[in-house]
Amino acid sequence: MPVGGLLPLFSSPAGGVLGGGLGGGGGRKGSGPAALRLTEKFVLLLVFSAFITLCFGAIFFLPDSSKLLSGVLFHSSPALQPAADHKPGPGARAEDAAEGRARRREEGAPGDPEAALEDNLARIRENHERALREAKETLQKLPEEIQRDILLEKKKVAQDQLRDKAPFRGLPPVDFVPPIGVESREPADAAIREKRAKIKEMMKHAWNNYKGYAWGLNELKPISKGGHSSSLFGNIKGATIVDALDTLFIMEMKHEFEEAKSWVEENLDFNVNAEISVFEVNIRFVGGLLSAYYLSGEEIFRKKAVELGVKLLPAFHTPSGIPWALLNMKSGIGRNWPWASGGSSILAEFGTLHLEFMHLSHLSGNPIFAEKVMNIRTVLNKLEKPQGLYPNYLNPSSGQWGQHHVSVGGLGDSFYEYLLKAWLMSDKTDLEAKKMYFDAVQAIETHLIRKSSSGLTYIAEWKGGLLEHKMGHLTCFAGGMFALGADAAPEGMAQHYLELGAEIARTCHESYNRTFMKLGPEAFRFDGGVEAIATRQNEKYYILRPEVMETYMYMWRLTHDPKYRKWAWEAVEALENHCRVNGGYSGLRDVYLLHESYDDVQQSFFLAETLKYLYLIFSDDDLLPLEHWIFNSEAHLLPILPKDKKEVEIREE
């Protein structure tokens, strides 16, 4: 419709009509104060255009439509949803998305339908308000400023893409340093020797069945005796092989290690046209390959690790440099999980790249990997933290926080772990990481850590200022983290953090002890008169997770309190009684049932983490001494970087 057709008509003094060739005044311009002049038409048009821009601009910030429909319109029952087959997801992982020790994203569906409805409505309001603010800010800019911002952003992205695609001219030669503490003598105590041998036999059972029924595939289905693949890895194969390499090495399963190495050399291929989880591929594949190189010195592992690292660089092609969660390995196009706070990146995912990327720069001689993860630090340090806490969601386009949901479990967990370990791995020179860690821990203690009526210490979740008194299995890693960082704590606080680690270990042991299977649920609650018990059906499963064993390992190494070996052996017996089947080890759908209901997946992290931590608990401390080795979020081993190899200089304020 022509603009003139939208404007009002005014009667002229002569009785004609102005505003179009109507009546006797056709073709004559109106005159006098009643006539609508050209400048007024332009102003009205501009106002109308601004209104349309605000309305349509908001659409792009609404949540994913499928999430909205399922959460708001259909009120789907979480109890009817199957347990996830794999590790998250922060972590999360909607089959493949909702898990994450981001270290893994939060698994399972939200709680009751009414809460889900309220969460979705709050999210819509928040996204709508953000869209209006951003549209108003854009309208206030001059056209020249908008054009300049667009050109600068395009130039930055183009420069990053060009730089990342520049071919590596071969890897520089490096002097392989023989690893410290990778061979240990047998424990002197016969009972401990027997228990350690049992755990090695468990590894053989898991490995041999994977080899027999799923060789070259990602994971094993031990009941149906076939392969299991998760979309987390796209078309990349061999997750269990790469994840198990360092466990095979330290258990001195030399023949199996050589088999795995040959498969990597001949079959591990990253030239695939598929979308992968940057976080999961980094901690499992990059971490596993780096660890295998540092233990064995085999060049193929260094080559493959750097090759994969280069493939992951396009994930950082965002305006802020905060990487995408998902990346197409062929096209280099990234995106985020559609359910993650309006397309935000997840703290536990982009915060769990630092250790591996610093080592990639160390082994390749190319600083680009270190620069990418140090930029993440720069972005985070510019942001205001609500109550000193780090929300789980960060928008990679705006560089601003998404929903103010804070968790030390799924979606947040390994970010905090990597701050502490970045300082330790730098030979205690990365003072910025140390400060960020202890500042975060202080805020966590103030706002999240609580004690139940019976004296159990737990870590709640923070949602916009309100606490949810729930603790996930993923959160149980924090006991070991607090204890590991105790020596570096501010003056007079070392014993406090060691005791805090012990209290978290006790709480997580209680979550195991209060089930029929003596294995812990995915999440447990402290409300409605219950303590350390899962009350929702979608939180009662156990998928061979390692976090409790991880905390037991650190607590044993740092205190030598025999109860940690006792608790670890209880877990071994429970795994043998309830998870072991003829075809390997399977997760359980409900740890409170009298009879097993299997999920039919042998997770790759069971070999990489759970069995490794158990083996170390029943080994002497000279096997992988903590002063020389750091464990990544998948329990892969990374040595302390020597001081003369620092990629980034950090000065204490």
Curated annotation (Swiss-Prot):
Disulfide-bond pairs as recorded: C476-C508
Cofactor(s) the protein needs: Ca(2+)
Q: What are the glycosylated positions?
A: N513
Q: GO molecular-function annotation terms?
A: calcium ion binding; mannosidase activity; mannosyl-oligosaccharide 1,2-alpha-mannosidase activity
The entry's localization annotation reads: Golgi apparatus membrane
List, alphabetically, the Pfam families matched. Answer: Glyco_hydro_47
**Transmembrane regions listed in the UniProt entry:** 42-62
Enzyme group, top EC level? hydrolase
Q: Single GO cellular component annotation? A: endoplasmic reticulum
Q: Which residues form the active site?
A: E522
Q: Where, in residue ranges, is this chain on the Lumenal side?
A: 63-653
GO annotation terms (biological process): carbohydrate metabolic process; ERAD pathway; Golgi apparatus mannose trimming; mannose trimming involved in glycoprotein ERAD pathway; protein glycosylation; protein targeting to ER
Please list the reactions this protein catalyses.
N(4)-(alpha-D-Man-(1->2)-alpha-D-Man-(1->2)-alpha-D-Man-(1->3)-[alpha-D-Man-(1->2)-alpha-D-Man-(1->3)-[alpha-D-Man-(1->2)-alpha-D-Man-(1->6)]-alpha-D-Man-(1->6)]-beta-D-Man-(1->4)-beta-D-GlcNAc-(1->4)-beta-D-GlcNAc)-L-asparaginyl-[protein] (N-glucan mannose isomer 9A1,2,3B1,2,3) + 4 H2O = N(4)-(alpha-D-Man-(1->3)-[alpha-D-Man-(1->3)-[alpha-D-Man-(1->6)]-alpha-D-Man-(1->6)]-beta-D-Man-(1->4)-beta-D-GlcNAc-(1->4)-beta-D-GlcNAc)-L-asparaginyl-[protein] (N-glucan mannose isomer 5A1,2) + 4 beta-D-mannose; N(4)-(alpha-D-Man-(1->2)-alpha-D-Man-(1->2)-alpha-D-Man-(1->3)-[alpha-D-Man-(1->3)-[alpha-D-Man-(1->2)-alpha-D-Man-(1->6)]-alpha-D-Man-(1->6)]-beta-D-Man-(1->4)-beta-D-GlcNAc-(1->4)-beta-D-GlcNAc)-L-asparaginyl-[protein] (N-glucan mannose isomer 8A1,2,3B1,3) + 3 H2O = N(4)-(alpha-D-Man-(1->3)-[alpha-D-Man-(1->3)-[alpha-D-Man-(1->6)]-alpha-D-Man-(1->6)]-beta-D-Man-(1->4)-beta-D-GlcNAc-(1->4)-beta-D-GlcNAc)-L-asparaginyl-[protein] (N-glucan mannose isomer 5A1,2) + 3 beta-D-mannose
Q: Which PANTHER family match?
A: MANNOSYL-OLIGOSACCHARIDE 1,2-ALPHA-MANNOSIDASE IA, MANNOSYL-OLIGOSACCHARIDE ALPHA-1,2-MANNOSIDASE-RELATED
Please report which protein family the annotation says this sequence is part of.
Answer: Belongs to the glycosyl hydrolase 47 family.
- The name under which this protein is listed is Mannosyl-oligosaccharide 1,2-alpha-mannosidase IA
- Gene source species: Homo sapiens (Human)
Q: What is the lineage of its organism?
A: Eukaryota, Metazoa, Chordata, Craniata, Vertebrata
